[in-house]
Amino acid sequence: MRDVTVIEADLSDAQHQTAVLYLVNAYARDPMGGGRDLPSAVCDRLIAGLRRHPTSLVFLAFDDATPVGIAVCFVGFSTFAARPLINVHDLAVVPECRGQGVGRLLLERVEAKGRELGCCKLTLEVREDNHAAQRLYQKFGFGDMPAEHGMVRNWFLQKGL
């Protein structure tokens, strides 16, 4: 990496919009993202949807002017802490830049934003077979959620609508 910078995206900026679409689609094409392009209808709705969502936060990593990584996050709320939290919904780095610290830079920026907002924690989900991402998250301090009587592994479930 020459000169990677991470910024909070301005989703009204055309360059940032292009970078978001490029990076999310690159993630979708990756085996960890499903292995195929996003449908054009999704691409058509993505930026407007993120802009309309009241708690979306998007961070972009650039190597000079080239987009190389993205973190798409949403601010939530912890009822047990009565404070906001940030969920890292998508974190992706283009294949040619993996293992070079881009993911860590994105997480550092997300963490800084969380501290700025007074968040109690960061959350994320990761595929069971995505060992590289798991190593990054563990090195960054992510772990199983604490419970009264020790550590408990949580499930992340979904139901299509």
Predicted region positions:
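Acetyl-CoA-dependent GNAT
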Residues: 2-83, 89, 107, 113, ...
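Short coil/turn motifs at secondary-structure junctions
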Residues: 76-78, 96, 129-131
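Conserved acetyl-CoA-binding loop-helix of GNAT-fold acetyltransferases
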Residues: 99-112, 135-139
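Conserved acyl-CoA
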Residues: 94, 105-121
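C-terminal "cap" of GNAT-fold acetyltransferases
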Residues: 3-5, 13, 118-161
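A short, internal acetyl-CoA/4′-phosphopantetheine-binding micro-motif in the GNAT/acyltransferase core
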Residues: 91-98, 127
